[in-house]
Amino acid sequence: MDLPPDSRTALRDWLTEQLADLLGEPLADVRALADDDDLLGCGLDSIRLMYLQERLRARGSTLDFAQLAQRPCLGAWLDLLACADRLSAPATVALPTVQDRDQPFELSSVQQAYWLGRGAGEVLGNVSCHAFLEFRTRDVDPQRLAAAAECVRQRHPMLRARFFDGRQQILPTPPLSCFDLQDWRTLQVDEAERDWQALRDWRAHECLAVERGQVFLLGLVRMPGGEDRLWLSLDLLAADVESLRLLLAELGVAYLAPERLAEPPALHFADYLARRAAQRAEAAARARDYWLERLPRLPDAPALPLACAPESIRQPRTRRLAFQLSAGESRRLERLAAQHGVTLSSVFGCAFALVLARWSESAEFLLNVPLFDRHADDPRIGEVIADFTTLLLLECRMQAGVSFAEAVKSFQRNLHGAIDHAAFPALEVLREARRQGQPRSAPVVFASNLGEEGFVPAAFRDAFGDLHDMLSQTPQVWLDHQLYRVGDGILLAWDSVVGLFPEGLPETMFEAYVGLLQRLCDSTWEQPADLPLPWAQQARRALLNGQPACATARTLHRDFFLRAAEAPDADALLYRDQRVTRGELAERALRIAGGLREAGVRPGDAVEVSLPRGPQQVAAVFGVLAAGACYVPLDIDQPPARRRLIEEAAGVCLAITEEDDPQALPPRLDVQRLLRGPALAAPVPLAPQASAYVIYTSGSTGVPKGVEVSHAAAINTIDALLDLLRVDAADRLLAVSALDFDLSVFDLFGGLGAGASLVLPAQEQARDAAAWAEAIQRHAVSLWNSAPALLEMALSLPASQADYRSLRAVLLSGDWVALDLPGRLRPRCAEGCRLHVLGGATEAGIWSNLQSVDTVPPHWRSIPYGRPLPGQAYRVVDAHGRDVPDLVVGELWIGGASLARGYRNDPELSARRFVHDAQGRWYRTGDRGRYWDDGTLEFLGRVDQQVKVRGQRIELGEVEAALCAQAGVESACAAVLGGGVASLGAVLVPRLAPRAEGSMELPAAQPFAGLAEAEAVLTREILGALLEAPLELDDGLRRRWLDWLADSAASALPPLDEALRRLGWQAAGLTAMGNALRGLLAGEQAPAALLLDPWLAPQAVAARLPDGREALARLLEALPTPAAGERLRVAVLDTRAGLWLDQGMASLLRPGLELTLFERSRVLLDAAATRLPERIVVQALDDGLLPAEHLGRYDRVISFAALHAYAASREGLALAAALLRPQGRLLLVDLLCESPLALLGAALLDDRPLRLAELPSLLADLAAAGLAPRCLWRSERIALVEALAPGLGLDAAALQAGLEQRLPQAMRPERLWCLPSLPLNGNGKVDRRRLAESMTRALGECRDEPSAEEPLEAHEQALAECWEAVLKRPVRRREASFFSLGGDSLLATRLLAGIRERFGVRLGMADFYRQPTLAGLARHLQAQTVEIEETQLEEGVL
């Protein structure tokens, strides 16, 4: 009927008719409602409101759901409609119907998700969407019950549906029964109970045979004592929750009085799906635009604590937590909801979201909300059993400190906004997000089933009683919240995946949820809805953070001067061969203090100390403190601009250096001049609260920030460690940390203050592990204190060269400690040596927490922070400064007696980072961490190390831990790479194999008579001409050449022509070399161009000399010839321009030999690629980064006269070992002494002598690198060594497989590289910024290079066509991943159907997930095809 827009009465009558129909209330009662009555209090919920909106839209209304939900009362709606267009009768639209109802039809989007989720390859898959219900009753008639089950199955087509290949089909009669009977009445009670528990566990988690039409199964177990246990197993592919209620109701009627069952409705589910799509096409298009616009801003799943990666759970099982609100509690909540204008479902949903936010790292997340959407024109739609569910995404952005009334209204507004756009369902939104490279997930479900009636219909209760228990499970769902009316109350149920969450976490969260709801029953909702920390957790943290300080307040330097007075002759410092006693050091310090006082230094002033490591540096620090000032340590290599920034920011009044410059700003005083001056009688008295030092750390803005620490703060930390370690005069501490790194504070004032001696490495030994090892052994060092990377360097030395058995305690801090490090350290140290891992911040007095490590438990992902030190406290807080529960990640705040005063002369930054609240003063570390449930603190990396890549939150520390867990990986560093689309990359350091046993015997050196003399003749000839030419030579270069000429002057040398004959050279070669050198020296080309010159490049020169030619020939002979059909993969390290390869090219191009050249310079590599045959592969090592796909790939690795190019030979050997497969061999030609001719060119590049090893040392280095060496041949100047690799067990496939077990796909690095060692910054920490820049450059080069893919094989091309059909895009690369090209699970299902149709091979989803690349799937498909052909052939023969 038409509704005139000017007739408010007619509009009201029509609205009340619709409401009466939707609410199931008498029309007279609805018409009696006032215009301002809140309809939510009358039973109107979101679903019914959505149905009303659709009815309005069918009559031409443009009102959306949100408008109707904003003021749900008749008067407001009439006002809105009065302003809207004329309403009319629904337009007559030809709705589609299914012609042949016996044919398969498509699944709905929700059914697709459930169907795909059953696959074993899905995360938390291998399980059906399933409900199991249990009832306990008596005197059931099995025959009548079986007949009732079959009756209901025949009434409803979807109870006879089979599901296959992503489609569904109605069967006339499924082959499997829908009833199961077990009679256990004769069993003992305990035996029957055991059997029941086993049966219940099986049936509650079973996957029904839906492919054969078994979608539900009704069971009866007859127990001893007359009890009957009735159970129902239902696959929710065929029925939603409302359908479950209908199924129960009809089972009750069919059992008690089947004649009362009405004729079933004629509506077919296929018709419904087709009609709904047609009716909602316009709304779906609008909703799609809405969600795509919101996509970049959508949050992700709740970041709840997990016990394991979801994909690691192969066979999910669920368990239920349940609580029933009483009738009184339920009524009070309903009354309060009506008073605040919200639905009861919104109340429960908001409370659920608040609990999730409390236990989530982020208070912004997505919820998955099912809508049971049965709207259709057929009035009997409510009598149809099928799955009418629509899933929608609900954005939750929970705010702290707001009242519950405000929170629930905000929640409801968001819910209504989502419902308004439900025509584009959640699954489509998530698929679109994945296609756009912004994957999201919504594995937490909020389902509300609060109908007017109870969950179990009266008809069923009359026959069998009420629900005893229930359990549900859904693929890909972590936690499923459900609400039901049961009896007079409301049942709250959480179904969660067993083993996914830490033990006890769901129970703790559920307890908080129930407690919140019970408090809401008795409150006005106007107070903040914050959830308190569980009481037991509060008590435990109070105990941990309440340890009293160990320190007696005093200055840092007091104890040392007291000890110097008590025992002046005791050793204080051991440096090189010097021994500085306490008395001598104290006197030097007081002399420096006297000089500073004379220069005008007064208490509180800042004095810079910028000296090389050594006794003078230590004396200067004590001297500054003795003068009453605070010291500002600056490295001697500090860049001038940064030095000026720090000096100005700190207000440095003068600097102690190795030069005198009184006019400089600040003035510089020579430490030697200060030491010659008079000494103070005693240190200037100072209060412990005075500033002791200012250490500058890097600032995020690029401006260094100076942490100002008082004496009292630092001494509190130091005393805690001294108390732990019991340091005394017998101890010797190796001081490897730089003065501007705060670990040195403990070395100086903890070590010397307790009476220990400091062993000081010299400035040039700052990164020399061999020098440290020598010092440890010589001085019997007992204490080690450093960043982990420095200890790793020390442990990399072979035990035969580094004896650490004097160490009794090792302190590590400042960076991640590898989990295997304690096990590698233990056998190298004294028995009983303890490893103490510390953490904290410079802003909190060196350290604030301690974890002593003996053994590493298997559940540790990293070495935890442990417990707070005495006098210090830790909090883990959220973004609002609230303490978060155990296991929840938050920001670490440090409090207590060791806090710094703040940032020097920067009150604004100090106020931001040092905060005050009701619990005291706290330093906000910017670190992420959490408390375990035993009170242990776990450090999880910097806040700025948690990154987002393609919308996915990623913790770099977790990626690194997963890499380090791989066999053969020593350490790793992950980073987000720039350069266009952000991606994740990582560098790993391979672990060297254990020391290898090889042969140290040396063959007799092959003589080359007259070679040295002949080479000297040519060298003198060239040098003489160059030195006489009018060329501007560098003084160092001229001196080096003249020195050589002088050294060789006394030698008796042959004539030039004889020298050329001995070398096998032509005179033209000599001329070419001289001309090339002359051009370089004249500036016609850059010195680096000599590496491209065939007569000057050092490797090329070595290969032209007789002994080099012989070594190269023997190396090539050592390469085996591949058998027919086999391949020999050969890698050449540090190829340079490959000029030396020319002499062996024919041998290297033999059939079956695959040659790959590796080079760190792209210029040289490009030159090699241009010159050499196309079949030779070239690979750049940008910044030394080796792409991980080359790990463990090669049968032979060649290094020709290149090992000396590495800073340490072990780095080159580690790289070679990483390239080799197990039992592969390194063929190494190395120079044993300099060649004069090679010196001509090399001196232009580097005026330092070449780092050449003696042959026994080289063999020892090979053995230490895990390579078993054998010298094959040698001359006096060059040697050929073969080394066998046991293999690291490390290759690209193994790495990928290991990462797949530990990390979800979004967290796996796109690219992996290998380095012999990670670069360190000045403080001995991994230089992450440098690595990220290197990886970004390397990635950019990789992306810029044209694809080297070979053409697709015929079977790959055929498969690619199948891919293109479903992906709607070209597929050209064999290593392309289906998912990276935009594929998803639904498209994969269609692809597998297409493969079956084209190739006749049935592949499972698990096969596809194992082989997601074109090449991998093609190989698998080819193997399956061959197997089928062989089977068919065998059958034909038989």
UniProtKB/Swiss-Prot annotation:
Segments for region (Adenylation): 563-950
Domain Carrier per the UniProt entry, residue ranges: 6-85, 1350-1425
Co-factor requirement: pantetheine 4'-phosphate
MF-aspect GO terms: ligase activity; phosphopantetheine binding
PROSITE patterns, per database record: AMP_BINDING, CARRIER, PHOSPHOPANTETHEINE
Ligase recorded as keyword: yes
EC number assigned by the record: 6.2.1.69
Gene3D superfamilies noted in UniProt: 3.30.300.30, ACP-like (1.10.1200.10), Chloramphenicol acetyltransferase-like domain (3.30.559.10), N-terminal domain of ligase-like (3.40.50.12780), Nonribosomal peptide synthetase, condensation domain (3.30.559.30), Vaccinia Virus protein VP39 (3.40.50.150)
Domain of life: Bacteria
Pfam families (alphabetical): AMP-binding (PF00501), Condensation (PF00668), PP-binding (PF00550)
Annotated region (Condensation/cyclization), positions in chain: 136-442
GO process annotations (BP): amino acid activation for nonribosomal peptide biosynthetic process; antibiotic biosynthetic process; secondary metabolite biosynthetic process
Domain notes: Modular protein that contains an aryl carrier protein (ArCP) domain which bears a phosphopantetheinyl arm to attach the activated salicylic acid, a condensation/cyclization domain involved in the cyclization of the cysteine, an adenylation domain which activates the cysteine residue into an aminoacyl-AMP ester and a peptidyl carrier protein (PCP1) domain which bears a phosphopantetheinyl arm to attach the activated cysteine.
Name under which the protein is recorded: Pyochelin synthetase PchE
Gene this protein is translated from: pchE
